[in-house]
């Protein structure tokens, strides 16, 4: 990542303002409340604009552009509007109107965002105000095209916890009871030579040598060999992930790959067959043969059962989300809402992903069969299926820390292409690699949390802040496509982790109804009747759609929890004071208060 200082546009910097205060989230604010700033964030320019609000019409305001955000504050006395948009959220910037435009507010900029909203600003035609704002926004929203660093490498925030220590692969596998006499940890990929998109540490069958792994890698797309993701604590069945076999049109076979899958199958003595879930529709899997890919045939893999899960590819998901945006922003058409939502097929895709994950979880838990999961390259649909199945099977992943580990492990370390799918700092908004695969996963988690309201330690805000910073480029957590790229860029040394922000203020993200249950398997109902559009995420920018507020019972429960904590604190203070009095030598007959025993509480 090239590093460069801020450019000539620094002339409007607010650095000379001497009086600042720091809010609880670490954001510096000057006393005039002009614009919030993070440590390392600098103001580039500010301009007077007309914000074309799709809900309330034109609003006169001042827009501030920093190296991290676009911040608009209304200048009108009857409007308190504020827009706070991280530049990483911006997907496209276009000029609207030309030199001959005569319509009111017809000359300015159109900004398309990745988080389901668009922005439109009208500017004066004289003084090159549009050109200046366009160039500055383009430069800092798409820094990779201008040899500038992503803001995460400039962010100087400090937190009292280090989110980079959340996930340690050795500790996580040890929690699962690994290694054991069937599975071993290998460092064959420590320099990312076996597979450059896999993590350095892998768990593989004990009976498979490193040379076996190298031979298997030649027959799997991108060298992404079958490796263990999760082992059942009781029946010892496993979830294994990989990419498609390189069968091709001629139906090539690889004895090493076939033997390797047999070794995986033999780690489980309860069932005679290994279950393979191919996430793709069968027609797509067949079509992949033309490009050298394919699937495990019955002829070659006698001891395996293959099932196709009919989950569509990244291009279908991208178009589906575009249709969702069309119906939720800026206006929601009530009269045709249900038919419009159905036409997007978004919930249908959510249903298919959840259904596939349920099959994986059920086969492992109830069917007592080990499972191998793959799609084409094993970093999109595969990650969705393994992580959701693990969330259903393992209650640890339903805690805040456990979910962070799940994301770090199954998505980040195993090479989901965040940079390509999100387009961090990249101006090529038409890139065919863009796709909302991780958003879809988080949506599935939200659907599960609605069906099991006491099963998850985290609340909806936890999921939303993860999605917001998926785009923001404020943290290093989701940057780059794989672990090897993050190592080269020293991401853990040079950037801050999103988990640092979350774990320094966990109470904000806790579900008050959470009940910790060990070994409870969740089987959500993946029917269209039980799935719903996540209004608080997809339609949150529309002020006419009332946000779903916590119900009175939840609010009262949270108040009681706060009251309990306050009473416990007071009680501890009284006990400390009483202990101090009892330890002092009495100078007079004991008073009733000195004789008071420690009070026990049922809280």
UniProtKB/Swiss-Prot annotation:
Outcome when changing residue 406 to P: In CNMX; severe
Effect caused by changing residue 229 to P: In CNMX; mild
Impact noted for substituting residue 278 to A: Localizes to plasma membrane extensions. Does not affect interaction with DES
Domain GRAM, first and last residues per copy: 29-97
Keyword Lipid metabolism (UniProt): yes
InterPro entries linked: GRAM, Myotubularin, Myotubularin-like_Pase_dom, PH-like_dom_sf, Prot-tyrosine_phosphatase-like, Tyr_Pase_AS, Tyr_Pase_cat, Tyr_Pase_dom
Record-annotated Myotubularin phosphatase domain positions: 163-538
Domain of life, per lineage: Eukaryota
Stated consequence of mutating residue 394 to A: Produces an unstable protein
One BP term from GO: endosome to lysosome transport
Annotated catalysed reactions: a 1,2-diacyl-sn-glycero-3-phospho-(1D-myo-inositol-3-phosphate) + H2O = a 1,2-diacyl-sn-glycero-3-phospho-(1D-myo-inositol) + phosphate; a 1,2-diacyl-sn-glycero-3-phospho-(1D-myo-inositol-3,5-bisphosphate) + H2O = a 1,2-diacyl-sn-glycero-3-phospho-(1D-myo-inositol-5-phosphate) + phosphate; 1,2-dioctanoyl-sn-glycero-3-phospho-(1-D-myo-inositol-3-phosphate) + H2O = 1,2-dioctanoyl-sn-glycero-3-phospho-(1D-myo-inositol) + phosphate; 1,2-dioctanoyl-sn-glycero-3-phospho-(1D-myo-inositol-3,5-bisphosphate) + H2O = 1,2-dioctanoyl-sn-glycero-3-phospho-(1D-myo-inositol-5-phosphate) + phosphate
Enzyme class: hydrolase
Result for mutant: residue 202 to S: In CNMX; severe
Phosphoserine found at: 13, 18, 588
Binding site for a 1,2-diacyl-sn-glycero-3-phospho-(1D-myo-inositol-3,5-bisphosphate): 288, 313-314, 376-381, 417, 421
PROSITE patterns recorded: PPASE_MYOTUBULARIN, TYR_PHOSPHATASE_1, TYR_PHOSPHATASE_2
Biased composition (Polar residues): 1-13
GO CC terms of this entry: cytoplasm; cytosol; filopodium; I band; late endosome; membrane; plasma membrane; ruffle
CDD domains: PH-GRAM_MTM1 (cd13355), PTP-MTM1 (cd14591)
EC numbers: 3.1.3.95
Disease as annotated in the protein's UniProt record: Myopathy, centronuclear, X-linked: A congenital muscle disorder characterized by progressive muscular weakness and wasting involving mainly limb girdle, trunk, and neck muscles. It may also affect distal muscles. Weakness may be present during childhood or adolescence or may not become evident until the third decade of life. Ptosis is a frequent clinical feature.
Domain remarks: The GRAM domain mediates binding to PI(3,5)P2 and, with lower affinity, to other phosphoinositides.
Family: Belongs to the protein-tyrosine phosphatase family. Non-receptor class myotubularin subfamily.
Protein name (record): Myotubularin
Organism placement in taxonomy: Eukaryota, Metazoa, Chordata, Craniata, Vertebrata
């Amino acid at each position: 990542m090239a590093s460069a200082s801020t450019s000539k546009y620094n002339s409007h910097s607010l650095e000379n303002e001497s009086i600042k205060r720091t809010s609880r989230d670490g954001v510096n604010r000057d006393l005039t409340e002009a614009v919030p700033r993070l440590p390392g964030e600098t103001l580039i320019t500010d301009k007077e604009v007309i914000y074309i609000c799709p809900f309330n019409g034109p609003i006169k305001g001042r827009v501030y552009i920093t190296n991290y955000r676009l911040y608009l504050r209304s200048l009108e006395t009857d409007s308190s509007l504020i827009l706070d948009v991280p530049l990483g959220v911006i997907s496209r910037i276009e000029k609207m109107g030309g030199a001959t435009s005569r319509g009111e507010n017809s000359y300015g900029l159109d900004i398309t965002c990745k988080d389901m909203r668009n922005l439109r600003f009208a500017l004066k035609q004289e003084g090159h105000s549009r050109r200046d704002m366009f160039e500055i926004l383009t430069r800092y929203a798409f820094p990779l095209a201008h040899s500038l660093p992503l803001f995460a490498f400039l962010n100087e925030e400090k937190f009292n916890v280090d989110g980079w220590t959340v996930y340690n692969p050795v500790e996580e596998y040890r929690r699962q009871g690994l290694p054991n006499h069937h599975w071993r940890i290998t460092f064959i990929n420590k320099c990312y030579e076996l597979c450059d998109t896999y993590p350095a540490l892998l768990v593989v069958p004990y009976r498979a040598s490193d040379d076996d792994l190298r031979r298997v890698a030649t027959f799997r797309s991108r060298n992404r060999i079958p490796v263990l993701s999760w082992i059942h604590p009781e029946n010892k069945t496993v979830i294994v992930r990989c990419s498609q076999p390189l069968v091709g049109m001629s139906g090539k076979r690889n004895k090493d790959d076939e033997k390797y899958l047999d070794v995986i199958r033999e780690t489980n003595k309860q069932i005679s067959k290994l279950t393979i879930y191919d996430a793709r529709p069968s027609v797509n899997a067949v079509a992949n043969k033309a490009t050298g890919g394919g699937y495990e045939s019955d002829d070659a893999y006698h001891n395996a059962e293959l099932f196709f899960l009919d989950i569509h590819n990244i291009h279908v998901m991208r178009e589906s989300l575009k249709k969702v945006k069309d119906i939720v922003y800026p206006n929601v058409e009530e009269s045709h809402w249900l038919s419009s939502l159905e036409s997007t097929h978004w919930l249908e895709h959510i249903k298919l992903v959840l259904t596939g994950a349920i099959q994986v979880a059920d086969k492992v838990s109830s069917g007592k069969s080990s499972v191998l999961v793959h799609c084409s390259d094993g970093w999109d649909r595969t990650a969705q299926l393994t992580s959701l199945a693990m969330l259903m099977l393992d209650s640890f992943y339903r805690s805040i820390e456990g979910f962070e580990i799940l994301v770090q492990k199954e998505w980040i370390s195993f090479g989901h292409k965040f940079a390509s799918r999100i387009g961090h700092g990249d101006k090529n908004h038409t890139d065919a690699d863009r796709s909302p695969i991780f958003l879809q996963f988080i949506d599935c988690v939200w659907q599960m949390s609605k069906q099991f309201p006491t099963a998850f330690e985290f609340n909806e805000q936890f999921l939303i802040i993860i999605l917001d910073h998926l785009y923001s480029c404020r943290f290093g957590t989701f940057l780059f496509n794989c672990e090897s790229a993050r190592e080269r860029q020293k991401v853990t040394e040079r950037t801050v982790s999103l988990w640092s922000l979350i774990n320094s203020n966990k109470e904000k993200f806790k579900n008050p109804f959470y009940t910790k249950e060990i070994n409870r398997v969740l089987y959500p109902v993946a029917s269209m009747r039980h799935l719903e559009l996540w209004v608080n995420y997809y339609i949150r920018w529309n002020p006419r759609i009332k946000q779903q507020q916590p119900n009175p019972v939840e609010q009262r429960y949270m108040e009681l929890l706060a009251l309990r904590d306050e009473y416990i604190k007071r009680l501890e203070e009284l006990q400390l004071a009483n202990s101090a009095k009892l330890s002092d030598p009495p100078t007079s007959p004991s008073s009733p208060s000195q004789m008071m025993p420690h009070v026990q509480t049922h809280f």
